[in-house]
């Protein structure tokens, strides 16, 4: 963990830690060259030149993305045994924080508005050549600003779709996921495609609309294999404000 006031690249001064996950740590930092606050994502350096090429490829991939729901990637570097992405700092609260503080489901109209924005973003990502997958969509990675804009964060897991990407990106980007929101194929390391992001978005919306964490895909699969009912209850049974048509869309998105 980097201590406050640590300076990297003679430029970025650490202010404090914003979050920590299975694949890295995110810090708030001051870019002293332009006097602007940025977010620094740190991950451990892998072994050899291959890892360096992977990092440069992934960072270049992210830096070329331009969408209003994505924080901009502005710089990247390696220092002290770690790789760093320098990203636009987004002020606001993530949806897991907001849901926990609220203690009740969000209103259906609000969730559908967020869903439309994220689906538009996923269309942008999935239609790129090669297609880009996020692979860790969840409430904690969606941040709402004071202007009520939504941003999808934590692209340390982003990768091109299998078979349409530099091979070096595959292993690097498979290092982590969040079980509650991950599709079965990702949990079993069987490869992912655009449908995997849609499963994760469906699981995220399920949580936001019910205030109940969704049953994970592996547990659901085992229950179904054992001839037992799917433990994932329909959304409209948990929240009567959700129309059956919306519940059906989420059920299809989260199909095992």
Per-region residue spans from a language model:
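Conserved N-lobe ATP-binding subsite of Hanks-type protein kinase domains
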Residues: 25
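Conserved N-lobe loop of protein kinases adjacent to the ATP-binding glycine-rich P-loop
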Residues: 30-37
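AlphaC helix of the eukaryotic protein kinase fold
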Residues: 42-64
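Conserved short submotifs of the Hanks-type protein kinase catalytic core
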Residues: 80-94, 98
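Protein kinase catalytic-loop region centered on the HRD/HxD motif
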Residues: 119-132
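C-terminal lobe helix-coil module of Hanks-type protein kinase domains
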Residues: 180-256
């Amino acid at each position: 963990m980097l201590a406050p006031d640590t300076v990297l690249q003679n430029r970025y001064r650490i202010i404090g830690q914003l979050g920590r996950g299975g694949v890295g740590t995110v810090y708030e930092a001051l870019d002293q060259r332009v006097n602007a606050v940025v977010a620094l994502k740190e991950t451990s350096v892998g072994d050899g030149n291959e890892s360096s090429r992977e990092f440069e490829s992934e960072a270049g991939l992210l830096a070329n993305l331009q969408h209003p729901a994505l924080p901009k990637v502005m710089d990247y570097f390696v220092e002290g045994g770690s790789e760093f992405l320098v990203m636009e700092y987004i002020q606001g609260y993530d949806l897991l924080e907001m849901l926990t503080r609220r203690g009740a489901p969000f209103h259906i109209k609000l969730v559908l508005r967020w869903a439309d924005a994220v689906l538009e973003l996923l269309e942008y990502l999935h239609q790129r050549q090669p297609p880009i997958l996020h692979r860790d969509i969840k409430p904690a990675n969606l941040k709402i600003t004071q202007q009520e804009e939504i941003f999808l964060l934590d692209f340390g897991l982003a990768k091109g779709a299998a078979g349409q990407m530099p091979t070096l990106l595959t292993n690097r980007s498979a290092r982590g996921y969040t079980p509650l929101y991950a599709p079965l194929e990702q949990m079993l390391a069987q490869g992912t495609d655009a449908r995997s992001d849609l499963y994760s978005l469906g699981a995220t919306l399920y949580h936001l609309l019910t205030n109940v964490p969704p049953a994970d895909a592996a547990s659901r699969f085992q229950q179904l294999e054992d001839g037992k009912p799917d433990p994932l209850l329909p959304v409209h049974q948990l929240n009567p404000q959700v129309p059956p048509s919306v519940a059906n869309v989420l059920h299809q998105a989260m199909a095992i």
